[in-house]
Amino acid sequence: MHLRHLFSLRLRGSLLLGSLLVASSFSTQAAEEMLRKAVGKGAYEMAYSQQENALWLATSQSRKLDKGGVVYRLDPVTLEVTQAIHNDLKPFGATINNTTQTLWFGNTVNSAVTAIDAKTGEVKGRLVLDDRKRTEEVRPLQPRELVADDATNTVYISGIGKDSVIWVVDGENIKLKTAIQNTGKMSTGLALDSKGKRLYTTNADGELITIDTADNKILSRKKLLDDGKEHFFINISLDTARQRAFITDSKAAEVLVVDTRNGNILAKVAAPESLAVLFNPARNEAYVTHRQAGKVSVIDAKSYKVVKTFDTPTHPNSLALSADGKTLYVSVKQKSTKQQEATQPDDVIRIAL
């Protein structure tokens, strides 16, 4: 065999081996970056506990076959189910008080909230927030978002309807302290600045409402955009250090960044219509789910640009972060309609940031 031919064969072999190693490296990196596991039907919000080293997922299960729902406790690394907490009421919204290690779940269709001991999985109590019977004329308000103030052991819950409220619940006794009235049409978004004693809510009227948690009074309300277009500011997440709010809009292809001191818009980030949003102070980033687009965006909170996009089909829903800000969790729903439920369970995705 000629020396030149032998060299050519060796070169081609080296190039092929190199390309295989590179492809394998990229494949391994992608696998390490994102882990996806099927968990259960009707997946909604999540809560993370560093103390318990666990992630909880609220699932409503089948609309037709299951009367209640299940809260799954997951290993935050492998996403394997380590406990299934069955409930007679369906859980949707979720939060945790990290001081008392109490999980709170909103039972939307029953206008109630359930408290669960994070360590044992035992139900600590339940509170019906709107006991009116549903009729053609009466629509009881429904719990949507929940936030817990660890410092005061208070839970704030947005009760949505044509004219929404925010319920203020005593976490120790699981009793209603008061209801903050007149928070607008479908005031779904809810975020708390515990140190600043401020609670923020957003609604389908296009408003940002600021509440003083010292007396539970509305301090201000501002229509964020006056452009003649329809807006539904569905969720909000805070950067309390820089007094900014990241606000998603399910009706417009942009995420707003707002100065919480005055309601002025700092930036409009181009992105598909959005659902959940979560700010990560450890990385100065915000994460956003785009339900219809089937994607999750990473927004650089310095440049206000989308710097990365994860494909998360079919419908990415809610977000949670590990305590160190190095891991993002996404609940992902399968395609489903009122006529045809999803046949497969919904998923949770773990993303290494």
UniProtKB/Swiss-Prot annotation:
Species this chain originates from: Escherichia coli O157:H7
Protein name per UniProt: Uncharacterized protein YncE
Gene3D superfamilies to which the protein is assigned, alphabetical: YVTN repeat-like/Quinoprotein amine dehydrogenase
Keywords on record: Signal
Gene of this entry: yncE
InterPro entries registered for this protein in UniProt: Haem_d1_sf, Host-pathogen_enzymatic-act, WD40/YVTN_repeat-like_dom_sf, YNCE-like_beta-prop
Segment forming the signal sequence: 1-30
